């Protein structure tokens, strides 16, 4: 009562009433907020308020000489008043319009080059298609996305050096341009920007947009590639989405997409080889994506995906500390655990040795189509809050979390034996055994889990064992939420180690990744992936193996030929012949190999029977472990095009066809390259044609090193001796003549001498 009297008393004074009714801001904190600091607190209001003034812009004094005081309509363009606190002039927005219409023109040739990213964006939007708007609840989760389409992938430091070199070439300061991409970009930009009149600062800023990946942590539902993110504000709101198809693709998105496909293919292939880690490294180093070496892309590209991270770990690069299980990325947000080996019995009384995590922990789980928060204790799921695009996605997340919890009722829900194997036919580890089992059929798991009554909590509902939603009951500890769980935002990278089976561990020994986690999804790469490694020949099927094997022999014919005559066993063991074995029927591989090796031995022993085409044709068959038998073959079978096709031992066939006149080899109708036979192969003149200018001294002499090919002879100095491999696969010792006059007689004597040297 007293307070009210006091207030009435105050209000009776006219000054009080005036202050309270006329002054809008009456709170010190608010006044402080809007008046302290240089940061503009309400930029859009400030802009509107400024633009409502007559002269909201300041300009350099020179403007008064270049722009008239009034325009054609008689409106004043600038004020004679100076700007307070600077020696600039106050200018009307109309002056800008006048300048744009009547101001001086400069060359516009550099604009599309400097503002390349903007011009390209306009093109993408022009050709993009906007579809209907749908109103529905948007489950958005914050993900780290690329907001800058069309960039290269240089690090900030690399880009800085390039920009300094292009924009301020004469500035002092050490700049080291080392990487291939730095040098290429610098050269290209220097040429493009010759005589450029645009302010260097602007050029530098625009170059940065082109060279460096910029990422932001944004709420997204739907596409995350940069061409979708640039229109995020047009395609998704809180309760609506608009369908959109970009009007063009950008290289950075294509690289990200192709990198993931290449990495998945490589990890899958490496996992089944004898030494997975060595194979993986060999393939990463010999693969190109869109003409750039894969290892260079891996060093610069921050894409986080299981296969990509395994490749990075193998190269000794740092990766994210989160771990992967069942296709979900787990990040521990609190708690800790210790690991202990325990033996558990499944519902089928099979013993599983499992590393049990003891202790209370909380995780976020982020997958492609669902996200969740998981709280667990030792072998017990305390709570799981899931959100997902659809019922199927929610179910996937629940299965992964149930298996991860290691609960007893999950282990007991196993029906039948667990014997899942990976691509290399090795048994999966117990946790992945369980995962595969329930991914196939989770009915028993869900039925046995148990259900509970639930309280009504805003934004959450229950889910029953048959995946129907309910507000009364739910599977124990499990709720479905409308809100998504944000991806882990940190870009922190940690040092990891990798073992030869491609299991990646952090420094405390926790497994972060393994080949089991690599997705089996097949996609078509946007950029050409060139796998030079023979291990990847089979990726495009049997025909590709066949063509690649023969192309490899032809490309390396000079060395292959020497090995064929001197060290055949080493040649037969070459890994390049490994993929070919899968084309040869298993039952007969050994016999074919024995037969071909015997045939080759005869060729080495009998003068004049060396036959380039035949050696190339049959060589891959000799790579299998040979079985000695008396069997002779006139044709050998390979399994391509879904059936057995024949390669004739003597003569051409649709599989292997050599055209003597054009010297072209075609495999299954595809060109496999040019095959240069030894001159006049199989005729006695071969030696003379080859050995002009050399004197034949006799049989091979090991003291003079390994046999050279005919092509390598030209490097000999006059009077120098060497062993040389001649047409028939025989090796003789020769000396380069000291005088050129006697060359003619060499041809006649060569034949006789070779016969003597060999026999």
From Swiss-Prot:
Name of a matching Pfam family: Flu_PB2_4th
Localization in the cell: Virion; Host nucleus; Host mitochondrion
Protein name as it appears in the record: Polymerase basic protein 2
Motif (Nuclear localization signal): 736-739
InterPro entries per record: Flu_PB2_2nd, Flu_PB2_6th, Flu_PB2_C, Flu_PB2_CAP-bd, Flu_PB2_middle, Flu_PB2_N, INV_PB2, PB2_helical
The organism's place on the tree of life at top rank: Viruses
Family: Belongs to the influenza viruses PB2 family.
Organism expressing this protein natively: Influenza A virus (strain A/England/878/1969 H3N2)
GO molecular function: RNA binding; RNA-directed RNA polymerase activity
Role played: Plays an essential role in transcription initiation and cap-stealing mechanism, in which cellular capped pre-mRNAs are used to generate primers for viral transcription. Recognizes and binds the 7-methylguanosine-containing cap of the target pre-RNA which is subsequently cleaved after 10-13 nucleotides by the viral protein PA. Plays a role in the initiation of the viral genome replication and modulates the activity of the ribonucleoprotein (RNP) complex.
